[in-house]
Amino acid sequence: NIRSIWNKEEQPSQWEALSNYIVSQNPQKIGINTSKYYGIADGLAKTDYDALIQSLPSKFQKRIVSAETLAVRWIETRTPLEVRLFSQLTGITHNIIQEAFSTKVITPGFTNTEDVVWWMREKVLKLDLNTWFHPTVDIQRSGKSDLYGFDGKPKFDVIMPGDLVHCDFGISYLTLNTDCQELAYVLKPGETDAPQFLKEALKQGNTVQDALTDNFIKGRTGNETLKIAIKESKKLGLRPQIYTHPLGLYGHSAGTTFGMWDAQQGVPGSGEHPLYENTAYAIELNAKVYIDQWQKDIRIMLEEAGFFGPSGFRYVNGRQTNLILIGQKSKYLE
């Protein structure tokens, strides 16, 4: 229990009691809940701030600082138990996606993207879990279709053979959250594998992932890491876009941020936060790839939970390196 320092009979004013205690302890810094960049560290109301200032002697007023770093370090740090649970939760997320991207759920030519979205929602409820955001399922394909399959897409886009299907999905359990984007290919009649050009495109997305996570170094800021990753990716002829964020007690948590959709040069505040051990991230990014066979660009949009600890970076429960195949025959059949 936290010991109370206020005796109402001796000092009716809480603010005076707080001020007297601060003076008696003579701290060199007085951390308060204010922050320019992190909402989680910016909860002190203006009225309370004014009352605190008015109650303190002037020399102590000058010692007031933001306690932002303390709040962010606490919220971003994962315990060993949380790391073990996180792996299990991410595994459940992968399993739901794998089942959603199968003929158990999808009948090519009949099932639409919203059908899959709501199947995912219902699956989560059956498992007594929660989602922290509404899932999305979208399609990229040959012919005239939007490069940004997730932006302005028709809600009832029927999934067809030859489609590249993408989802963005995350669940919540025991205060932790996952955030995952994966890709599937719908086999055409007679096909047993995805086209080589799509498999090569996925490899480009994986290479951008490596360019980012291979440069995770303790003490390096998100903006520094982002700059290196983009430079290395472009040197390999890739077209990257990185928007990786902290993950844990919140889906978009506080901590080191590596780019945003509209901030590929760096992010003020959270991008300047250094990388610490025992922290988790949604490794979220995409690689734009021109597909000759489709005469258009596509985006390989990927997102996987990652952990940075004393041994370096690792994926919490693996990452996608092969396309999920929708319509694949059972292995016992020839």
Report residues per predicted region:
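Active-site neighborhoods and metal-handling regions in enzymes and metal-associated proteins
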Residues: 1-334
